[in-house]
Design a protein with these regions (language model features):
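N-terminal lobe/hinge region of extracytoplasmic solute-binding protein
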Residues: 25-39, 47-106, 137, 220, ...
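Extracellular/periplasmic solute-recognition and catalytic clefts
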Residues: 139-142, 146, 228-239, 265-329, ...
Length: 610
C-alpha cells in the first residue's frame, strides 16, 4: 500500500507547529489534503522581471465590496487571492490553498479547515482563524453598503467557528450535498487587523464611513502580489511578496507567479495600446478580434519571430450574457417588444461576417458548460425580420416613420440605446444596428468608458446593455432574477425582471439538497428566462488567444481546461504559469537592432476543443 503524508503533517514536522485539536473539535474527522493531483506549472520557470500590461480606465475604487466595486479591475484584487481551498484546473478536485487540510462534518452543513502554518498577509501579519470568522462581521455589516453580500452571508452562512489560531469551521445555512457544500463554505479570508475600525458608533465592528474611508486603500494580500504603487489615473504596480512567499510551501503553487512586478498603465485606446505592444512597451496583447489575429499581426515583429501568437482552447463554464433588456424602461416591459428585439438582433450574421466565425453563438442566455444544470433544449433565436415585425405589430408598432423606424399610435419610436464599454465593439454594435433596421427597429450606440459603463448598468440607467458575466461551476440565479434585486441599484438584476414563479423556483433551487431536483429547478428557471426574452444570447470565446514577445515563456502544453488567459493581459485571470527569460529579452533586443530574425511562431493547442 502506498503511504502518504498530509500537507499539514509535513509542514508541522518541518516548522515545528503543533497540530493538536481543540477539545471541542470532533475527534472522528477525516482530514484531507489531496497532494497527488498533476502539476501544471513548469519546473523550468525563472523568478524575476517586470511584466508590463495596460487597462483602458482607472478603477473607481480598490474596494472589492460596496458601490462601484464590481468593475473590470476587480479581478486584479480578487482572482490571485487565495481562498481556503481551490479547484485543480484540470481534474476539478479540491486542492490546498490557504488551508492545508479540510474535513467534512456529518451534518451536511459543516466543513472544517486547518490553515497552512506559513500563511501570511503581504504586510507580514499571520493569517489566522480570526481572518475567517471576521468574514461574517465584515459581510453582514450595513456599513459596507453591499446588500447582496449582507443577504448571502446572513442567509447562506450560519456561522464561522474558531477552534484555535489555525483551525476553524464554516457552517452552511442549509444542508447541502457534498458537491456544493464546499462551494458555499470555501471562503476568502479578510484581514481583520487591517479593517479594525477607528469610528464604530453602531458597534458592528466595521468603520462607519467604510465606503469612503477605504475607497483607495488596497487591503493586504494573501496571494503572491499586492498593490505597491499607484498613480491615480495613470498607473498601478503590483509587487511580488518575494521568493519566500508562504504559498510556495504549497506544492501546487511551485513555479507559478514568477514575475517580480506587474506594471499596469492606463491606455484609454486599444489601438494605441497595440502600438505600445508592437514597440515592446507591453509584453502581451489579447487578440480578441479577427483583425487582431489576422491583419494586425502581419507586421515585421511577428514575421521576424520577435512576437509569437497563441490560440488555445479551454472548457471554462460560460456565464450569462448578450443583450440585457431593462424592463423598467419604457416599452421594454412588453413581451412582444422583447420578442421582436430578439428576432431582429442578428448575432449569427455578426459572428459570420464581422467576427469571421472566430466565436460561437451562445445558445442559452444564462450560459452553458454547467453539465446537467444546463437546459440543452434552449436555443438562441435566429435572425428573422419578418417574425420580428409580427411581434412589433402586436405591440402596436404597425406604422413606419419616414426614417424607416416603426412608431405606434402615440408617436413613440421603436428605438433603444445599446450601452457597451469598449471602442473596439463599435463595429459589432454598428452591424447589429444596420440589421435591426430591416425590422423597423433602431439601435443607438451608447459607448461609455470601461469602468463607468458597468457603474451605469449597475445603476440601471441602461435600456439595453451588451455584456457578459462570469460564472461558477454551479450557476446562480438569485442575483439576476429574484424580486429582491429588481428595480434597485448596485446589484446584478440588470433586466429588472422577476415573477412570483421565478422567486419560488429560485428559492427552491438555492435550498434543494437533492441534486437531481436542483438540476430540474435550474432548467425550469432558464426556460422562464428564455421565454421572457430579457436577455438576447450573445456569443462566447472558448479559448485563450494572445500575442506575446518571445522572452515570455510558457509551459508545454500551456493550456488547462480552466485557462482563460496565458498572461495578465489587461486582467488578472491567468494561472501565473508564465515567466520572463531575461537572456532571451536581451537576445531579442539585440537581434532587432542588428536585423537578425527568428522563425515566426504560431502555437495552436486544441486538446480541450469541444
Amino acid at each position: 500500500m502506498k503511504k502518504t503524508m498530509s500537507l499539514s503533517a509535513l509542514l508541522a514536522m518541518t516548522f515545528g507547529s503543533s497540530l493538536l485539536m481543540a477539545a471541542d473539535l470532533p475527534a472522528d474527522l477525516n482530514w484531507q489534503s489531496n497532494l497527488h493531483e498533476p502539476r501544471f506549472a513548469s519546473p523550468q520557470a525563472k523568478f524575476g522581471g517586470t511584466f508590463h500590461t495596460y487597462i483602458e480606465s482607472f478603477p473607481q475604487t480598490f474596494r472589492v465590496v460596496g458601490p462601484d466595486s464590481n468593475g473590470r479591475f476587480r479581478p486584479w484584487l480578487l482572482d490571485s487571492r487565495p481562498s481556503a481551498v481551490t479547484r485543480h484546473p484540470d481534474t476539478k478536485a479540491w486542492i490546498p490553498d490557504i488551508a492545508s487540510e479540510w474535513a467534512y462534518g456529518d451534518d451536511n452543513k459543516t466543513v472544517y479547515f486547518r490553515i497552512n502554518p506559513n500563511a501570511k498577509w503581504s504586510d507580514g501579519e499571520p493569517i489566522t482563524s480570526e481572518d475567517f470568522t471576521f468574514v461574517l462581521t465584515f459581510m453582514r455589516s450595513k456599513d459596507i453598503v453591499a446588500p447582496w453580500y449582507n443577504t448571502f452571508y446572513t442567509q447562506q452562512i450560519e456561522d464561522v467557528i474558531q477552534y484555535d489560531e489555525r483551525t476553524f469551521a464554516v457552517v452552511s445555512g442549509e444542508k447541502r450535498n457534498a458537491e456544493e457544500l464546499m462551494l458555499y463554505t470555501n471562503m476568502r479570508p479578510i484581514p481583520a487587523h487591517f479593517y479594525r475600525p477607528k469610528k464604530d458608533e453602531n458597534h458592528d465592528g466595521i468603520q462607519d464611513n467604510f465606503v469612503r474611508f477605504y475607497n483607495f486603500k488596497p487591503e493586504p494580500s494573501a496571494g503572491p502580489y499586492y498593490v505597491d504603487d499607484m498613480k491615480k489615473g495613470k498607473s498601478i504596480t503590483f509587487k511580488h511578496v518575494g521568493k519566500d512567499w508562504w504559498g510556495y510551501s504549497n506544492p501546487y503553487y511551485l513555479h507559478r507567479y514568477n514575475v517580480e512586478k506587474i506594471r499596469i498603465k492606463v491606455i484609454r485606446d486599444k489601438d494605441i495600446a497595440r502600438q505600445h505592444f508592437e514597440k515592446g512597451n507591453l509584453d502581451s496583447f489579447w487578440l480578441d478580434t479577427p483583425e487582431l489575429w489576422r491583419e494586425k499581426t502581419e507586421t515585421a515583429n511577428f514575421e521576424q519571430g520577435y512576437i509569437h501568437k497563441f490560440w488555445g482552447y479551454n472548457q471554462v463554464p460560460i456565464g450569462a450574457g448578450g443583450l440585457w433588456l431593462n424592463t423598467a424602461k419604457p416599452l421594454l416591459d412588453q413581451l412582444e417588444v422583447r420578442k421582436g428585439i430578439a428576432l431582429a438582433t442578428d448575432f449569427d450574421g455578426l459572428i459570420e461576417k464581422v467576427l469571421r466565425g472566430d466565436v460561437v453563438r451562445k445558445p442559452n442566455p444564462m450560459g452553458i458548460g454547467h453539465g446537467d444544470y444546463t437546459n440543452a433544449d434552449i436555443k438562441a433565436p435566429s435572425f428573422d425580420p419578418a417574425k420580428a415585425i409580427a411581434h412589433f405589430e402586436k405591440a402596436g408598432f404597425s406604422q413606419i416613420g419616414p426614417d424607416g423606424i416603426r412608431v405606434n399610435e402615440q408617436g413613440q419610436r421603436l428605438s433603444f440605446g445599446i450601452t457597451y464599454s469598449y471602442g473596439y465593439l463599435t463595429p459589432q454594435i454598428a452591424y447589429l444596428k444596420e440589421q435591426a433596421k430591416l425590422a423597423g427597429l433602431e439601435f443607438t450606440l451608447n459607448l461609455i468608458d470601461g469602468s463607468s459603463a458597468f457603474k451605469y448598468v449597475l445603476e440601471k440607467k441602461h435600456e439595453l446593455s451588451f455584456h457578459s458575466m462570469g460564472t461558477a461551476e454551479i450557476p446562480a440565479y438569485w442575483e439576476y432574477f429574484h424580486s429582491t434585486n429588481a428595480n434597485k441599484p448596485q446589484n446584478n438584476n440588470f433586466t429588472n425582471f422577476s415573477t412570483p414563479e421565478l422567486d419560488r423556483l429560485i428559492m427552491a433551487y438555492r435550498t434543494e439538497f437533492d441534486l437531481e431536483k436542483k438540476k430540474v429547478h435550474a432548467k425550469q428557471i432558464q426556460a422562464i428566462v428564455a421565454d421572457a426574452g430579457v436577455i438576447v444570447p450573445g456569443y462566447m470565446r472558448p479559448y485563450a488567444r494572445e500575442a506575446f514577445w518571445r522572452w515570455l515563456q510558457i509551459p508545454q502544453p500551456a493550456m488547462t481546461k480552466s485557462t482563460e488567459f496565458l498572461f495578465p493581459s489587461g486582467t488578472f485571470r491567468d494561472l501565473g504559469t508564465y515567466w520572463i527569460d531575461e537572456s532571451l529579452k536581451k537576445e531579442t533586443k539585440a537581434a532587432m537592432k542588428s536585423g537578425k530574425s527568428f522563425a515566426p511562431v504560431t502555437i495552436l493547442e486544441e486538446e480541450y476543443k469541444l
